[in-house]
Amino acid sequence: MNYGLTHTPSLTTSECLVLGVFSDLALPDFATAIDNEQQGLIKKLCQRVPEPGNTVWQTDVEGHSLLIIQCGKKEEFSANSLQKRVGEITEALIKQRFSSATVCLPRLNQESAEWQLEQMIVQIDNLRYQLLDFKTKHAKSHKLESVIFHLPGATEKSLEMAKAIVTGVEFCRDLANMPANICTPTYLGEQAISLSKQFDQISCQVIGPEEIKEMGMGALLAVAQGSDQPPRLIDIHYHGNKNSAPVILVGKGITFDSGGLSIKPANAMDEMKYDMSGAASVLGVIKACALLKLPINLIGIIASAENLISGSAVKSGDIVTTMSGQTVEIINTDAEGRLVLADALTYAERYNPDFVIDIATLTGAIIVALGNIATGYMTRDEQLAKSIECAANESQDKVWRMPLDEAYQDALESPLADMINAGFDRSAGSITAACFLSRFTEKYRWAHLDIAGTAWISGKKRNATGRPVPLLIQLLRHVANSR
């Protein structure tokens, strides 16, 4: 996909010129000039869009097309309005099978041109994204391949930043959408190594089962033991500032989750290929950071395995010893994500991080609580919470803070081990899962993102969303600016 900027939009810049106008129908100077050349055509078309979101087409204007969209009152044109208008424009361009367009929308009053450009590109890229498919016969596809923006105040630097973000999001989506017979733990490791070969600032180590065992990662090994696919611990570094403490992102990389012996229902089990979306987001963020050349140190740690059923699979009631030395009674084999994360979070201690954020499709309970709008997050660190909230607001990648009170820890008591891996009832499931993880994070500042509701869209049109890559990139940009 090609994105660009122009200071002099015209009908001939691309196949279609898109013009956003406010309800007063006042035209910017360039549009007035075009209107004069076309004997008042634009003003006539504007009369046909009386309500916000209304559109009108005019084809065959000097061999090109013109789309007018009404943006409402100037004083009411907000970030939400922008998102709606960009969505309507993108869907219209795709429906009309345009391969290129020049988009001229009004500036937001309260936001920078850089921010507005990023939001428009992220929105367009999200809607034009096409699933990787394995069909032997393909219908003729027609993709929107080029969008040029006229946005006073936007710079080439801001354009390159926006392109880096959507590249990271696309990489995340491509990985998450890959079928589980291809995207195995080994494949994830290969993708991480590939990043280290693409960028000089990235290095990578992929650790196999023998060394995982030597390090005492009994929880990760327990989850993996039911599958013929060996587990992988991926340790990938972006070296942007050798003098600063690293930020660590820990990703859950369960490339397929049957639930183990606590087997999931058949309905929608195919979507459990998305259980590695946390890992995919970590790799997407690292790729974007390399493109952005952020002056930070960033480490991605991914614990990857398959959770399957076999004669060697872990059983309900088994007790395992984690890398931290703490023991866990496995009450529910379908609460496997927190097990692999426990060892990965302990592994993170060796790097003396500034802070750690884990990203995981961890619980169905978070979907019940928040649906697919906001990512649930938990932390005891108020400064980190403020940073996450700020990044979420700026990136429009929504979050909602859930409690992490000490009283919830009681649900994890075991008569046989230091803890159980899941509560005996379903109450407060997302919170007790985070409480479990908190027991492995006492040596650093930590936050947990439960992306089970936001990482993918379910159903017939199932598709990875690429969230929370925009949120995390914005957070890391703040870290970079503070150093």
Swiss-Prot record:
Binding site for Mn(2+) 2: 252, 257, 275, 336
Recorded superkingdom: Bacteria
Classification via Pfam families: Peptidase_M17, Peptidase_M17_N
Binding site residues for Mn(2+) 1: 257, 334, 336
Cofactor, how bound (note): Binds 2 manganese ions per subunit.
UniProt-listed Enzyme Commission number(s): 3.4.11.1, 3.4.11.10
GO annotation, biological process: proteolysis
UniProt GO cellular component terms: cytoplasm
Reactions this protein catalyses: Release of an N-terminal amino acid, Xaa-|-Yaa-, in which Xaa is preferably Leu, but may be other amino acids including Pro although not Arg or Lys, and Yaa may be Pro. Amino acid amides and methyl esters are also readily hydrolyzed, but rates on arylamides are exceedingly low; Release of an N-terminal amino acid, preferentially leucine, but not glutamic or aspartic acids
Cofactors required: Mn(2+)
Molecular function GO labels: manganese ion binding; metalloaminopeptidase activity
Keyword Manganese in record: yes
PROSITE patterns named in the record: CYTOSOL_AP
Record keywords: Aminopeptidase, Cytoplasm, Hydrolase, Manganese, Metal-binding, Protease
Main location: cytoplasm
Active-site residues annotated for this sequence: 264, 338
Subcellular location field: Cytoplasm
PANTHER family: CYTOSOL AMINOPEPTIDASE, LEUCINE AMINOPEPTIDASE-RELATED
Similarity remark: Belongs to the peptidase M17 family.
Role according to the record: Presumably involved in the processing and regular turnover of intracellular proteins. Catalyzes the removal of unsubstituted N-terminal amino acids from various peptides.
Protein name: Probable cytosol aminopeptidase
Naturally occurring in which organism (per UniProt): Legionella pneumophila (strain Paris)
Gene: pepA
